[in-house]
Structures are given as structure tokens and as C-alpha cells.
Amino acid sequence: MLYHGVDLVEVRRIRQAVMRYGQRFLARVYTAAERADCEIAPQVMRYEALAARWAAKEACAKALGIGLRGLGAFTVDYPRAGLHDIEVVRDAAGRPTLHLSGVAAQTANALQIRALAVSLSHTDELAIASVVAWVDLSGV
């Protein structure tokens, strides 16, 4: 069985948040590893990289069927992951991968998710992420 989540982000919204709130916004949304990874991107592509990671966090939350804490003033009755609970990191080959902790990891374990795949892409204006979660039902 597969679960899928996709999210599209306007790069300008991330750029505006960084310009307005600076390090406070970056530290709230991105882990230290994510911030460091985006810092090595050329300045012109930094906002695209940040937007793609934001989209990945949202897409992963959608694939898991959970929300993200801190993204609005609405109340929900299901678990919500913190923004740092879903981390976009690179593997040894440079491919983006997801590292889950907290509510995100607990939910993935409860759903018996065996693997996550993430794909990121962006233009100057938009960033998109797709997350596929694989559940092994062979033992069911």
C-alpha cells in the first residue's frame, strides 16, 4: 500500500518570511542541518531550496495524514507534528531524504511505514515536493 502527499509553495512567500523575520523564522521552521544545507546553495537559489524543504514537510505530513503545528490558528483533533519533526537531509549521493522524529515518527510507526521517498523540484517562482510512503502489507 502507498500513501502519497504533494505540496506546492510560492518561493516569494518564503523569501518574504525570511526578509521579515530572519533567523527567527529560519530557526522555527528548519533544523540546523536544513539551514546549513540551504546556506551552501548559491544566494539566488537559497529561497528556492528553503521553499522546496517547506513543501517536503507539508507533503510528508499529508502522506502521513497529520497536520503540522504552528501553521495557522485552527484547532484539530488529530496529532500534529512539529516543523522539526520532519527533516529534509541529503544521503551520501546528495539525494534528498526524510528523517522523522516526534509525532511524525510515531505516526509512521503506527502506520507501519517501511520507506519514504521524496522528490523536490522548483522554478524561480514555485517549489514542489512529492512524498510517497510505502507500507508492507505482505504479513497481513
UniProtKB/Swiss-Prot annotation:
UniProt GO BP: fatty acid biosynthetic process
Catalytic activity, EC: 2.7.8.7
Superkingdom in the source lineage: Bacteria
Catalytic reactions of this protein: apo-[ACP] + CoA = holo-[ACP] + adenosine 3',5'-bisphosphate + H(+)
UniProt KW keywords: Cytoplasm, Fatty acid biosynthesis, Fatty acid metabolism, Lipid biosynthesis, Lipid metabolism, Magnesium, Metal-binding, Transferase
Subcellular location: Cytoplasm
Binding site for Mg(2+): D7, E58
Cofactor: Mg(2+)
Role summary: Transfers the 4'-phosphopantetheine moiety from coenzyme A to a Ser of acyl-carrier-protein.
NCBIfam families, A to Z: acpS, pantethn_trn
Family statement: Belongs to the P-Pant transferase superfamily. AcpS family.
The protein's name in its UniProt record: Holo-[acyl-carrier-protein] synthase
Organism per entry: Chloroflexus aggregans (strain MD-66 / DSM 9485)
